[in-house]
């Protein structure tokens, strides 16, 4: 059976089991309404307040005017884990581009994970309730990993479902203007 299909099925089952709840039984944060209240998924993502591993809240809106690479991942996702060192190397190569890993997992699992595998870019937690967010952003299966490259003006440059190809992503990043 196709590995991507298996991964997507696993994510869908996890989402169904989680029922929209994140770590410690809290309801997943609801995305803010878009500028006109129309539910623009990119605007919603930019405004979404997400905790880092220390519990401090952040949003992508804080990086307005800068190119951003957002990587949705999970500790249990083998392709996600494989691509993290490659994303870390690209982040170091392009210091003017903001990178963030948004964990579709619990803060406790991510904390244990980073004790073994460290990255230099920030990791935020969205929890299992993220599947809806992923779908709205153009990932109908809600599969992981899922990477979105944003231009400095906040528009989407490209979406990558599945493991990144470092040389391919490098070409995209080299063309971004800060």
Question: Which residues fall in each region the model found?
Answer:
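Short active-site neighborhood of thiol/selenol oxidoreductases, capturing the structured segment around
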Residues: 59-77
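C-type cytochrome heme c attachment motif
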Residues: 75-82, 146
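Active-site acidic short loop of glycosyltransferases
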Residues: 63-66, 96, 119-120
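Short acidic-hydrophobic, aromatic-tinged amphipathic segments that line or gate anion-handling sites
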Residues: 124-126
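N-terminal targeting signals for export/organelle localization
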Residues: 1-47, 178
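Structural microenvironment flanking redox-active thiols in thiol-disulfide oxidoreductases
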Residues: 81-118, 128-134
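Short, ordered coil/turn segments that flank beta-strands lining enzyme active or ligand-binding pockets
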Residues: 53, 63, 152
């Amino acid at each position: 059976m196709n590995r991507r299909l298996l991964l997507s099925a696993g994510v869908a089952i996890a989402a169904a089991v989680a029922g929209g709840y994140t770590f410690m039984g809290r309801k997943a944060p609801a995305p803010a309404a878009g500028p006109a209240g129309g539910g623009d998924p990119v605007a919603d993502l930019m405004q979404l307040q997400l905790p880092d591993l220390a519990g401090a809240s952040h949003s992508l809106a804080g990086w307005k005017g800068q190119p951003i690479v957002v990587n949705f991942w999970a500790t249990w996702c083998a392709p996600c884990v494989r691509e993290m060192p490659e994303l870390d190397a690209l982040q170091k190569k392009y210091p003017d581009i903001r990178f963030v890993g948004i964990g579709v997992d619990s803060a406790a699992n991510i904390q244990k994970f980073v004790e073994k595998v460290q990255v230099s870019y920030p990791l935020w937690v969205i929890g299992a309730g993220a599947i809806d967010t992923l779908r709205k952003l153009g990932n109908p299966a809600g599969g992981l990993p899922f990477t979105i490259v944003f231009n400095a003006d906040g528009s989407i440059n490209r979406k990558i479902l599945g493991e990144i190809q470092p040389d391919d992503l490098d070409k995209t990043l080299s063309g971004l203007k800060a």
